[in-house]
Amino acid sequence: MARKKVALDFEQSLADLQTLVERLENGELSLEDSLTAFEQGIGLTRDCQSALAQAEQKVQVLLERDGELAEEPFDAEQPE
C-alpha cells in the first residue's frame, strides 16, 4: 500500500506542478503570486526528482544478480 501512496504522491505532485506552470505561463498572476507559485514549483520539482531517484534505486536493487549490479534499460513494453 505504501508503494501506491508514493505513486499517487508523485502523480499528484506532477499534476500540481503542471497547474503551476500553466498559471505562470498565463501571465495573469501578480509578481508576488508568481514568486509564490515559482517557490511552490521548485519544491514540487524537488519532490518529483527525489521520488524518481528512489524509484531508480529500487529498480537497480531489483536487478542485482550474483552480487553484481546488472543495469538494464527500462522497457515499459517488455512483458514480465
Curated annotation (Swiss-Prot):
Entry protein name: Exodeoxyribonuclease 7 small subunit
Subcellular location: Cytoplasm
Function: Bidirectionally degrades single-stranded DNA into large acid-insoluble oligonucleotides, which are then degraded further into small acid-soluble oligonucleotides.
GO CC terms in record: cytosol; exodeoxyribonuclease VII complex
EC number(s) per entry: 3.1.11.6
Assembly with partners or alone: Heterooligomer composed of large and small subunits.
Top-level taxon in the UniProt lineage: Bacteria
Record-stated family: Belongs to the XseB family.
Catalytic reactions of this protein: Exonucleolytic cleavage in either 5'- to 3'- or 3'- to 5'-direction to yield nucleoside 5'-phosphates
A GO BP annotation: DNA catabolic process
Swiss-Prot/TrEMBL keywords: Cytoplasm, Exonuclease, Hydrolase, Nuclease
Listed Pfam families: Exonuc_VII_S
Record has Membrane as a keyword: no
GO molecular function: exodeoxyribonuclease VII activity
PANTHER family on file: EXODEOXYRIBONUCLEASE 7 SMALL SUBUNIT (PTHR34137:SF1)
